[in-house]
């Protein structure tokens, strides 16, 4: 009996199981990340060029950060200096995470978590910076004399139209603070669990990952809503500090590193790239996405540099005016 006769005499269920196993193996070979040794032993010209470009973009981003920090240290007061440096430092950290993902593809989920953490950390720091622009929460309440604030701001501008205007008090500002500070604790715990599942049991991770998404989305929406309300409050007092531009730069972390990442991760599956394991489709796909993020982080860093010129420039103008008055 030859091989063809053996094939036709096999149980049909065995044929189906073999086909399914083969398809599963093909899928795994496309999705599996290579080890560091396999990655560099099979390096291609495209990946070498990508690493070179990614390194240059990361160095450029760090240079922009150093220039911005140098300017801030010369002109900002100490209460504003720390939070301002932390805010402009989010973007070079994201660039380093994207570079590490290209250098070590297997570390992509940890690096993606680092990008996510930047928004979780940036939210509370930015809120602290906002109230330091006016001294403190108590000073804001005194300075505005109980002026009411609207709650229908993005991302809840449509569903909160029925909510009345609120007069800021110590208790209500405390609630706003908790809405922002829940992000690092709540999302940090979820991302820690997801990292453990991904690197310990990836099959279990793929089964349960969708159950975590609603909790992460709700946490981000609550934090962003509270920050938008706070920006609107402080803008009435410090309208020349470009607070909306600073908030937009922070939101770009989520938009570019989270939403864009997830969208492109699925969309690029329709384009055939790479070959068989180890330099497979997933490696090419992640390299392209992270190169795009690196380019965007350079542009965002330039925008951040422009946004954080104030209150530096405002303080310089005030000093110049005082000098002119004393001369007169």
Curated annotation (Swiss-Prot):
Query: Member of which family?
Result: Belongs to the OST-alpha family.
Which residues does the annotation flag as glycosylated?
A: 2, 15, 25, 42, 280
Keywords for this protein: Cell membrane, Glycoprotein, Membrane, Transmembrane, Transmembrane helix, Transport
Q: Which InterPro entries does its entry note?
A: Ostalpha/TMEM184C
Described purpose of this protein according to its UniProt entry: Probable transporter.
**Ranges that cross the membrane:** 45-65, 85-105, 107-127, 178-198, 209-229, 248-265, 288-308
The root-end lineage is: Eukaryota, Metazoa, Ecdysozoa, Arthropoda, Hexapoda
Which regions face the Cytoplasmic side of the membrane?
66-84, 128-177, 230-247, 309-328
Name of this protein: Organic solute transporter alpha-like protein
Q: Which Pfam families does the record associate with it?
A: Solute_trans_a (PF03619)
What are the subcellular locations of this protein? Cell membrane
Q: How does it sit in the membrane?
A: Multi-pass membrane protein
Which Gene Ontology cellular component terms are annotated?
Answer: membrane; plasma membrane
- The species is Drosophila melanogaster
Please give the residue ranges for the topological domain Extracellular.
Answer: 1-44, 106, 199-208, 266-287
């Amino acid at each position: 009996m030859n091989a063809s006769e053996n094939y036709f005499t096999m149980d049909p269920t065995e044929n189906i199981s073999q086909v399914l196993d083969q398809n599963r193996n093909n899928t795994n070979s496309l999705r599996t990340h290579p080890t560091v040794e396999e990655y560099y032993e099979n390096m291609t010209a495209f990946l070498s060029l990508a690493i070179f470009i990614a390194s240059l973009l990361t160095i450029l981003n760090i240079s922009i950060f150093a220039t911005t920090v140098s300017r801030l240290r010369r002109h900002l007061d100490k209460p504003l200096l720390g939070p301002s440096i932390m805010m402009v430092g989010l973007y070079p950290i994201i660039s380093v995470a994207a570079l590490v993902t290209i250098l070590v593809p297997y570390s992509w989920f940890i690096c993606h978590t680092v990008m996510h953490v930047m928004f979780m950390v940036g939210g509370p720091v930015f809120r602290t910076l906002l109230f330091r622009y006016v001294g403190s929460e108590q000073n804001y309440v005194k300075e505005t004399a109980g002026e009411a604030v609207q709650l229908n701001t993005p991302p809840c501008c449509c569903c909160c139209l029925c909510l009345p205007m609120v007069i800021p008090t110590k208790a209500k500002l405390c609630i706003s603070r908790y809405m922002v500070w829940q992000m690092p604790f709540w999302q940090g715990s979820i991302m820690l669990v997801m990292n453990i599942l991904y690197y310990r049991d990836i099959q279990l991770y793929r089964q349960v990952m969708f159950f975590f998404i609603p909790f992460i989305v709700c946490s981000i929406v609550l934090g962003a809503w509270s920050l938008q309300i706070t920006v609107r409050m402080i803008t009435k007092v410090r309208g020349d500090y470009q607070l909306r531009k600073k908030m937009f730069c922070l939101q770009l972390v989520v938009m570019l590193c989270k939403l864009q990442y997830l969208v492109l991760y699925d969309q690029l599956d329709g384009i055939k790239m790479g070959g068989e394991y180890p330099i497979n489709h997933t490696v090419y796909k992640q390299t392209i996405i992270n190169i795009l993020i690196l380019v965007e982080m350079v542009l965002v860093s330039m925008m951040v540099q422009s946004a954080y010129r104030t209150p530096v420039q405002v303080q310089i103008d005030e000093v110049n005016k005082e000098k002119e008055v004393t001369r007169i």
